Amino acid sequence: VIEISNLGDPLMAKEKSKNDAKELINQIIFITHISKSYKFHIQVHTYEVKDRIQPLCVNYDELSTSALSDEIIYNVDFSFSQRNNIDSLSNIGSKFKELCFPILTNSFNNDLLEKLRVSINWYSASINSESLNESFLFCAIGMESLLTTGRDSITKVLAENTAFLIAKDDIESRKLVYNTMCNLYAKRSGIAHGGNINIETKELKQIRYYLAMSIIKIISKIKADEINSNKDLITFLDNQKFG
């Protein structure tokens, strides 16, 4: 059960609360899905499990894109409350609460957080779609909404920004992400223009991974107070390219 209330005109407040609930559900879908990249799986229950929550330290540097057969299932309290006095570094529920904190906090409302919300909504739509092509397209749109400015060639800007945001600092890593993103986005254009494009599962997983990592990187930089607006993000990426 999600209970959300907003002040103001009753009808407008109701619509705002409905939209807030949808976005929170999308964020839970996002968090639940990306947990597989951290070598564990989040299982959300509809009954009380707080007495059986299992703590786990998470290393955010050791990511995995491959499917794992030995996933560990952990029960997680998704109440986003402060009721449990557990060290935030050892409780996985608290860790993801920390990760998504800026998106759920109205006091940090700005253009960059709006981009994050939109991108997570597209990620969630991709998870809920049963069509590979549609899921792929939704992720591509999420990448566009997060990392393009609309000023120059979308493919070039999107590929560069993805590479400088999520790749390692060495040239080869950035070139790999850049070239991969260019190839993926070419397929997005083919789908959008009615071309006979058939997306493979590995291509969907790749662009979905890029979108997830882009979202996480930006949230981490907001948390570290390195960027606080879309203008800051653009400046950061430009400095990475030309600094």
Where are these regions (language model features)?
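Generic hydrophobic alpha-helical scaffold/packing signal
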Residues: 127, 143-144, 163
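Short, hydrophobic/aromatic alpha-helical segments in well-folded domains
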Residues: 122-125, 138, 180, 187
